[in-house]
């Protein structure tokens, strides 16, 4: 407990309450405060001006981050014929159809993203009770049900993140790791915000971007000055 208390004191001494941090300063400070033995993720929380109780104001989609997240992503693709070959060439880790469905039903789920060609949904649809709770069910809204499986694989491997408003109207995403170049984190956040802007519900009124917060896996959250971002 002594170490934890010492770290908490150090954090309190470094952070200014109520301050809006330029994104560059926030990234540098989060890296300075990181004191764990593993490589922490850098995460962003974006408070949106939506009413999550209304179905037409739920914001959901995907964004390809220009500098990726730093994580290795294993991709499974449900496709057959030429589409299966395209998926393999694009770098998919697992490609199959009925055989892949049998693996999933048998509990063999060693992947992070599932992509399906539209014709494969008759097979994938039966796996909803298995894939759904794990957040792996393909969905056209986030680009994981698509005829262009090759591009979807490249997106997933290249740092695509999926987002969805929670009950508080907040989007949570990983935008890199401690040790990333400051500008890379900034550009990843800006890419996400640009896509969120495109996804703004027409029924959402008032200020859409209410607050942006950067944090690390085990670190504090720092409120970001919107003037330091292209929004």
UniProtKB/Swiss-Prot annotation:
Domain of life: Bacteria
Gene Ontology CC entries for this record: cytosolic large ribosomal subunit
UniProt xrefs under SUPFAM superfamilies: Ribosomal protein L1 (SSF56808)
The entry's keywords: Repressor, Ribonucleoprotein, Ribosomal protein, RNA-binding, rRNA-binding, Translation regulation, tRNA-binding
GO molecular function, one term: structural constituent of ribosome
InterPro entries: Ribosom_uL1_bac-type, Ribosomal_uL1, Ribosomal_uL1-like, Ribosomal_uL1/biogenesis, Ribosomal_uL1_3-a/b-sand, Ribosomal_uL1_CS
GO BP annotations listed: regulation of translation; translation
Function: Binds directly to 23S rRNA. The L1 stalk is quite mobile in the ribosome, and is involved in E site tRNA release.
Subunit structure as annotated in this protein's UniProt entry: Part of the 50S ribosomal subunit.
Family recorded in the similarity comment: Belongs to the universal ribosomal protein uL1 family.
This protein's name: Large ribosomal subunit protein uL1
